[in-house]
Amino acid sequence: MASNSALLMKTIFLVLIFVSFAISPATSTAPEECGSESANPCVNKAKALPLKVIAIFVILIASMIGVGAPLFSRNVSFLQPDGNIFTIIKCFASGIILGTGFMHVLPDSFEMLSSICLEENPWHKFPFSGFLAMLSGLITLAIDSMATSLYTSKNAVGIMPHGHGHGHGPANDVTLPIKEDDSSNAQLLRYRVIAMVLELGIIVHSVVIGLSLGATSDTCTIKGLIAALCFHQMFEGMGLGGCILQAEYTNMKKFVMAFFFAVTTPFGIALGIALSTVYQDNSPKALITVGLLNACSAGLLIYMALVDLLAAEFMGPKLQGSIKMQFKCLIAALLGCGGMSIIAKWA
């Protein structure tokens, strides 16, 4: 079921890509610099190339550290998944994901889809970024809800013979063990849906920012951008790694999910380098494609951070039973959001 949900989200993103390329900018009245080489004196492809190659390996290592740290936390006594420290770290990582959606991905989408390089009609007459982010959040909600309910219904059918078909009786003393087990399985499924959908949104965003870095040749800003992206990927990986850990996948699946997260930004950088002769980040088609993808990623990340991560944690029995823990986790979430807000100055 979780794999079907991820497949649906991938299909939606692919449809958006095809739609963006189907929209023709042929009659554009954009300035001449749109889709052409920049006149910025800082642009130097020969000097930028070694920096971008270094960025591939540095960001790869930072991503591996970020996503791998939570996965190895079971081997550290004070970082057990049921402990207070791990809960605080999860809230910090959730704040990072929320900050990524609000401070990085969504503003980029607004900037791209309102660029002067795009036609006045329709791009400047309708807030496509906000609309698609909202739609993406609702679609994520639908997938999250339907995947859980379908699993619950399927599991309920499987235990009907033991319940003798009496779904309206108050025989809690007989069905309680089954219900607890069913609830545990449903929660595990939710963790798995969360991990897969969150990984999808992060991967799309990571490829996009990697592509942008690989295509740029601005030596005045590239060093700061690389440093910011290292912190960005490491902290974002912590959030994803925590979700993968809770999903209780097999070691092989954990490795595969961590691997794909770690390599997506370096892959995007390599792709940007390879396409740097033909890809122009200010061309209409590039702006539309990346802008639409960023809007969808933003809606997904914001929903996942607020609903499936922060709200689920704060409304759970652990935090509801301790005002002190609520305060600590709130501070951690604010620090995560604040950190990503600071990084937004450079990336």
Swiss-Prot record:
Q: Which residues lie on this side of the membrane: Extracellular?
A: 23-52, 106-125, 214-224, 276-286
Q: Which residues lie on this side of the membrane: Cytoplasmic?
A: 74-84, 147-192, 246-254, 308-326
- InterPro entries per UniProt: ZIP (IPR003689), Zn/Fe_permease_fun/pln (IPR004698)
| MF-aspect GO terms | copper ion transmembrane transporter activity; iron ion transmembrane transporter activity; zinc ion transmembrane transporter activity
Name the species this protein comes from: Arabidopsis thaliana
**PANTHER family xref list:** FE(2+) TRANSPORT PROTEIN 1, ZINC/IRON TRANSPORTER
Membrane topology per record = Multi-pass membrane protein
- Chain positions of cross-link Glycyl lysine isopeptide (Lys-Gly) (interchain with G-Cter in ubiquitin): K154, K179
Signal peptide from the UniProt entry: 1-22
* Reported impact of H104A: Suppresses transport
Outcome of E111A?
Answer: Abolishes zinc transport. Abolishes iron and manganese transport
- Transmembrane segment boundaries: 53-73, 85-105, 126-146, 193-213, 225-245, 255-275, 287-307, 327-347
For whether the record's keyword set contains Ubl conjugation, the answer is yes
Q: What is the effect of changing E236A?
A: Suppresses transport
Q: What is this protein called?
A: Fe(2+) transport protein 1
**What happens after mutating K179R?**
Suppresses ubiquitination and loss of activity
| Mutant lacking the gene: phenotype | Plants exhibit a lethal chlorotic phenotype.
Post-translational modification remark: Monoubiquitinated on several Lys residues. Monoubiquitination controls trafficking from the plasma membrane and targeting to the vacuole.
